[in-house]
């Protein structure tokens, strides 16, 4: 089960997400569902059905889990998804 403690080592496809900070101000506020992930990007399907490609390194994401929301710096998500799932993360988050 996905929790705030293991989100960095979990599959992101299918999660609801919102961009809360970004270098490109036009990206802030984009909401939707993660439909694809590459090494450096997340593909988000917006509510109107359009897909938007967001670079991980310039955004902060707010993922909606069951019962809570988790804010994640996109730089921590960089890497191929299958490698990130195996990687050990030594960062503690203040909740």
From Swiss-Prot:
What name does UniProt use for this protein? Ribonuclease P protein component 1
Which family does the record claim for this protein?
A: Belongs to the eukaryotic/archaeal RNase P protein component 1 family.
Give the catalysed reaction(s), semicolon-separated. Answer: Endonucleolytic cleavage of RNA, removing 5'-extranucleotides from tRNA precursor
- State a single Pfam family of this protein: RNase_P-MRP_p29
Q: What class of enzyme is it?
A: hydrolase
**Superkingdom as given in the UniProt entry:** Archaea
Keywords, ordered alphabetically: Cytoplasm, Endonuclease, Hydrolase, Nuclease, tRNA processing
- Cellular localization per UniProt: Cytoplasm
Any single GO CC term annotated in Swiss-Prot or TrEMBL for this entry: cytoplasm
Q: What job does the chain carry out?
A: Part of ribonuclease P, a protein complex that generates mature tRNA molecules by cleaving their 5'-ends.
Annotated GO biological processes are: tRNA 5'-leader removal
Gene Ontology MF terms in the entry = ribonuclease P activity; ribonuclease P RNA binding
Which EC numbers does the record give? Answer: 3.1.26.5
Classification via Gene3D superfamilies: Ribonuclease P/MRP, subunit p29
- Where does this chain mainly localize? cytoplasm
Organism, by scientific name, is Methanocaldococcus jannaschii (strain ATCC 43067 / DSM 2661 / JAL-1 / JCM 10045 / NBRC 100440)
Say if the entry is tagged with keyword Membrane: no
Q: How does it assemble?
A: Consists of a catalytic RNA component and at least 4 protein subunits. Forms a subcomplex with Rnp4 which stimulates the catalytic RNA.
Q: Where is the signal peptide?
A: none
Q: Which SMART domains match?
A: POP4
